[in-house]
Amino acid sequence: MKKLMALALVVSFNLKSEIYEIRDYTIEEEDFEAYVYWAENHFMPYGNARIEIIDFWVNRGDEAIVEGTNPMVSPNGQPNVTWVAKYKNREERDAFFANLDVDPEWEKVWSKHPNPDAYIHSNARFFKSIK
């Protein structure tokens, strides 16, 4: 019985092997609206055709709430762009990003970026669902 339960746990974990990537960007204020336009009209169509983008959010001015026993805000400020993608596993995610370097379609999308140097700060975090 113990072996059966252990096997069930292993199978259950493997069935939930998908990962969620949460990406946060702090985009230069003067480039922000042009970046949002690019994201909506160029990045999202490209990304949605290739990966499962859960959602893509932008902050247009609502102040963040930073709390805790030692709250710190980055000297770069709070992110003003966040998006979440779901992948089967880390390998699928890494393959997507590695392919950007060789994909002519991505080259077209990136060439329309208003300012590739507008990313003050970028952060990618990886999570598994416990739901």
Q: Where is each model-derived feature located?
A:
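A short, structured loop/turn motif at beta-sheet edges
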Residues: 49-50, 88-91, 131
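Glycine-rich beta-strand-turn "strand-cap" elements at beta-sheet edges
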Residues: 52-78, 101, 105-131
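Short amphipathic alpha-helices in soluble, non-transmembrane regions
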Residues: 37-41, 96-103
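Core segments of cupin and vicinal oxygen chelate
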Residues: 32-51
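Sec-dependent N-terminal signal peptides
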Residues: 3-13
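Short, well-ordered beta-strand segments in beta-rich or mixed alpha/beta enzyme
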Residues: 19-26, 64-101, 125
